[in-house]
């Protein structure tokens, strides 16, 4: 145990927080290219076919990113924008693809929460 005087001279260093999204390297979003678009099943007790894409980011990292919303137009070589944010029931999926940006279309016919899915306001 350190003495008070030692702590006055040299305080304890706070442990650095480990990043939840290391591939973004501190950036809010990153651009990347889809190398594979496929579906995976969630862990128990959920059941579905979740749409994901393997993406090679501009910094060279390759990550698995979730494609949110109903339906998508992504295929191999699509250029996408990646943001952080994990999917709780898909182990290893720590990133989301931003809808309505670059090659990713927004969710057509979406009326609520449109800003999260890249959809314009419908004409009345």
From Swiss-Prot:
One of its GO terms (cellular component) is small ribosomal subunit. Keywords: Methylation, Ribonucleoprotein, Ribosomal protein, RNA-binding, rRNA-binding, tRNA-binding. InterPro entries: NA-bd_OB-fold (IPR012340), Ribosomal_uS12 (IPR006032), Ribosomal_uS12_bac (IPR005679). GO terms for biological process: translation. The keyword RNA-binding applies. The modification 3-methylthioaspartic acid is found at residue 89. CDD domains: Ribosomal_S12 (cd03368). Residues 1-24, 103-124 are annotated as: Disordered. The keyword rRNA-binding applies. One of its GO terms (molecular function) is structural constituent of ribosome. It holds the Pfam family Ribosom_S12_S23. HAMAP family: Ribosomal_uS12_B (MF_00403_B). With S4 and S5 plays an important role in translational accuracy. PANTHER family: 30S RIBOSOMAL PROTEIN S12 FAMILY MEMBER (PTHR11652). Belongs to the universal ribosomal protein uS12 family. Part of the 30S ribosomal subunit. Contacts proteins S8 and S17. May interact with IF1 in the 30S initiation complex. This is Small ribosomal subunit protein uS12. The gene is rpsL.
